Amino acid sequence: MSYTVIYAGTFDPMTNGHLDIIERASELFGQVIVAVAKNPSKQPLFSFEERTALVRQSCAHLANVQAVGFSGLLADFAKQHQAKALVRGIRGSDDIEYEIQLAQLNDKLSGRLDTVFLPPSVTWRYLSSTMVREIYRHQGDVAQFVPNAVLCALKEKE
């Protein structure tokens, strides 16, 4: 049986850590929807449309992955797409309590929505979008941390 799962985030910017989780999820599940959150409470480096396009470009090599922008409740989005589960990357103990609360809330809101936690590969365990933005803002080289599409988009912003 083939399952649809959702990997959601703001992806501002998408990192190689995100891509690692997506690639591994694509091997485990029939379809992976990368849900790019609009999140109006944040001041993003990239617009909603840019983030969605960059995720789409970064995942183009994965036939069973699609990028979709969304706003509103993730539980509602999951229902609309008949997803069986959410995939969440979990870097360490700092993430666990928050992620478990989020998983329980999404399950309650949807009626039944499991969450699958995937630890990142050791190479990317320390990496976050926040760190990439900080390196970028201080004119550091982020090439090793982001997919090529994101790197090109960052260079265009300079």
UniProtKB/Swiss-Prot annotation:
Listed Pfam families: CTP_transf_like (PF01467)
Keywords on record: ATP-binding, Coenzyme A biosynthesis, Cytoplasm, Magnesium, Nucleotide-binding, Nucleotidyltransferase, Transferase
Catalytic activity from the UniProt record: (R)-4'-phosphopantetheine + ATP + H(+) = 3'-dephospho-CoA + diphosphate
Subcellular location: Cytoplasm
Disulfide-bonded cysteines: none
Cofactor(s) annotated in UniProt: Mg(2+)
Reported function: Reversibly transfers an adenylyl group from ATP to 4'-phosphopantetheine, yielding dephospho-CoA (dPCoA) and pyrophosphate.
Subunit and interaction comment: Homohexamer.
Name the UniProt record assigns to this protein: Phosphopantetheine adenylyltransferase
UniProt organism field: Actinobacillus pleuropneumoniae serotype 5b (strain L20)
Lineage of producing organism: Bacteria, Pseudomonadati, Pseudomonadota, Gammaproteobacteria, Pasteurellales
Name of encoding gene: coaD
